[in-house]
Curated annotation (Swiss-Prot):
Biological function: Small subunit of the glutamine-dependent carbamoyl phosphate synthetase (CPSase). CPSase catalyzes the formation of carbamoyl phosphate from the ammonia moiety of glutamine, carbonate, and phosphate donated by ATP, constituting the first step of 2 biosynthetic pathways, one leading to arginine and/or urea and the other to pyrimidine nucleotides. The small subunit (glutamine amidotransferase) binds and cleaves glutamine to supply the large subunit with the substrate ammonia.
EC numbers on record: 6.3.5.5
Protein name: Carbamoyl phosphate synthase small chain
Keywords of this entry: Amino-acid biosynthesis, Arginine biosynthesis, ATP-binding, Glutamine amidotransferase, Ligase, Nucleotide-binding, Pyrimidine biosynthesis
Length: 375
């Protein structure tokens, strides 16, 4: 059994199918119908519980190759868990996977009702426990739990040292990931790792960019020096967890990179940090965008792209003073992409690599390659 307590006073008890223990975090909902392993292992969900709108989970099991990272969300909530999986690439059940990664699994709850609660109240803090089942004690645990905006989440998911990414994209012929081939690499880029998804790095390398992964706290002077010596051709600012406004030290370094006119691409958290670094602070959405079915309009082509998204924060409208808005979300008209006027920088809020989700925005990586050619 697992007991849940939400900050709005809601107390629930349900079945456990994951790890044992007690976890507190922010509760968000995800509307993806597949790809739960990639969602669970996305570093951007660090410190969060994910409730899936898809009522069934577990039918394809899990494997040792599709993880986005070594890190995981705090817990998973689903209407029904299926222990009997069927997939040629599966190595173990989802339950075994969650237990190995220390992730709580909750099933047998009315997820539709929970999602309506989040839609009405916004994201809520929650504590879940397979050990403590007293409502008052759970309330006390939650009261003392740090808010996600005050937690040093990025430092817990970033690489501790400079590394080279060794994998490229998935090969549907072999049903495995291609090894990175140095011969296909045309340029080297620095990846500022705030919690980068593996498939973003795969896609960068698939378009001919060798990815050198740097810690989140890397000094701008080090990257500027590498750029001036032509050791790197540009910089990618990755996705990651938490409130972007909490990363003040990193924002200060990014300001220097912008002033150095280094070509850059930002995705998700990276997109937000580029905005903040230029004096345009982000704001928090009521319940965020999480899922692989969000329509986004490309304002240049007028095409509507179905995108994968995972964020709770958004850049402000007045960023139009220094940037051309390139994409908008058709659910709420929030900004999804910009091209800066004052520097060779493009950034998007959604995830062009998807994983899970459609590949309709994959061209963003090729646009970055074209941007690098001009410098």
């Amino acid at each position: 059994m697992v007991s849940l307590y939400l900050e709005n006073g809601l107390f629930l008890q349900a079945q456990s199918f994951g790890a044992s223990g007690t976890q507190a975090g922010e509760l968000v909902f995800n509307t993806s119908m597949s790809g739960y392993q990639e969602v669970i292992s996305d570093p951007s969900y660090k410190g969060q519980f994910v409730v899936f709108s898809m009522p069934e989970i577990g039918v394809v099991g899990a494997n040792s190759k599709d993880d986005e990272s070594f890190f995981s969300c705090a817990g998973v909530l689903a209407r029904h868990y299926n222990e009997f999986f069927s997939n040629s690439r599966a190595d173990f059940s989802l339950s075994a996977y969650l237990k190995e990664r220390g992730v709580l699994g909750v099933c047998g709850v009315d997820t539709r009702s929970l999602i309506k609660t989040l839609r009405h109240h916004g994201c809520l803090m929650m504590v879940a426990s397979t050990i403590e089942h007293d409502k008052n004690k759970l309330e006390e645990i939650l009261k003392n739990a740090p808010k996600i905006s005050h937690s040093p989440l990025v430092s817990s998911v970033s690489t501790p040292k400079i590394t080279t990414h060794q994998r490229a994209t998935f090969d549907f012929k072999t049903l495995d990931y291609k090894p990175f081939d140095e011969k296909t690499s045309h340029k080297i880029i620095a990846v500022l790792d705030f919690g980068a998804k593996g498939n973003i790095l795969n896609e960068l390398q698939n378009v001919g960019l060798k990815a050198l992964i740097y810690p989140h706290h890397t000094k701008a002077s080090e990257l500027i020096k590498a750029y001036e010596k032509k050791e790197i051709s540009g910089i990618f600012l990755s996705n990651g967890p938490g409130d972007p406004l909490s990363l003040q030290q990193e924002i200060g370094e990014i300001k220097q990179l912008i002033n150095a006119k280094i070509p850059m691409l930002g995705i998700c958290l990276g997109h937000q940090l580029l905005s903040i670094a230029q004096g345009y602070p982000t704001y928090k959405l009521k319940f965020g965008h999480h899922g692989s079915n969000h329509p986004v309009k490309n304002l240049k082509t007028n095409a509507v792209e179905i995108t994968a998204q995972n964020h709770n924060y958004c850049v402000p409208e007045d960023i139009e003073e220094i940037a051309i808005i390139t994409h908008r979300n058709l659910f709420d008209n929030t900004i999804e992409g910009v091209r800066y006027k004052n520097a060779p920088i493009i950034s998007v809020q959604h995830h062009p690599e998807s994983s899970p989700g459609p590949k309709e925005s994959h061209y963003i990586f090729k646009e970055f390659v074209e941007l690098l050619k001009d410098f």
